[in-house]
A protein has these predicted regions:
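Active-site helix of classical SDR
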Residues: 129, 165, 173
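Alpha-helical segment proximal to the catalytic Tyr-Lys
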Residues: 134, 178-182
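Residue(s) in the substrate-gating loop at a strand-loop-helix junction
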Residues: 149
Length: 217
């Protein structure tokens, strides 16, 4: 008898999912995986040409909707456009985020940068979830996945605004789960480590290695 276990293929046929920050990087990977699993997806981003090109590549299962996570009106309009394009929403992946502060000490960080990171990563995640809530509740089995970061769990240095924002996302996820659970909406967060994507290409190799070592110390 073979001891090899085969992974069960996850199918999401007909599920309708909005992914923020999906024009590149992890968001793009999520969108591709969702479509491959049978879901219908709305790609939202501020990188319009990239987002539109990805939607065209993925075919009729994907749509692009512009959305600026620093702008409340843009978020509301984007979520409504996504729900209209898909005929509702079953899932939301709050992936969109910015760093903007990598490599700076907390003393070097300016208040404007701090506020910008919080606006996008924290306020944007909150407002997107609020806007999507009626559609997710109507689904009967709504799902929200928030993107946190393991840097918030071990306290990566020279990344203060970002790790603070991702710590807030973890706390918000717990609160959202309690508030939205009775409405049939499940809320979870994932906290990936430093991922080699276009948005992290600026990070020097020695810093990658430091992150790998330091989080285990």
């Amino acid at each position: 008898m073979s001891s090899t276990m085969q992974a069960t293929e996850i199918r999401l046929d007909g599920r309708r999912v909005l992914v923020t920050g999906a024009a590149r990087g992890l968001g793009e990977a999520f969108a591709r995986a969702l479509v491959a699993a049978g879901a219908r997806v709305v790609i939202s981003d501020v990188l319009h040409e990239r987002g539109e090109a990805l939607a065209r590549e993925l075919g009729t299962a994907a749509h692009y909707v512009p959305m600026d996570l620093a702008d409340g009106a843009s978020i509301t309009a984007g979520v409504e456009a996504a729900a209209a394009a898909l005929g509702g929403l079953d899932g939301l992946i709050n992936n969109g985020a910015i760093t903007n502060s990598g490599g700076k000490t907390m003393q070097q960080l300016d208040a404007a940068t701090w506020d910008r990171v919080m606006d996008v990563n924290v306020r944007g995640t909150w407002l997107t979830t609020v806007a999507a809530q009626p559609h997710l509740a109507a689904s009967g089995s709504g799902r929200v996945v928030n993107l946190a970061s393991d840097t918030a769990l071990w306290g990566a240095p020279r990344l203060m605004a970002y790790i603070a924002s991702k710590g807030a996302v973890i706390a918000m996820t717990r609160g959202m789960a309690r508030e939205l659970g009775p409405q049939g909406i499940t809320v979870n967060a994932i906290a990936p480590g430093l991922t080699l994507v276009e948005a992290t290409a600026y990070v020097p190799e020695e810093r990658h290695q430091y992150y790998l070592r330091a989080r285990d110390e």
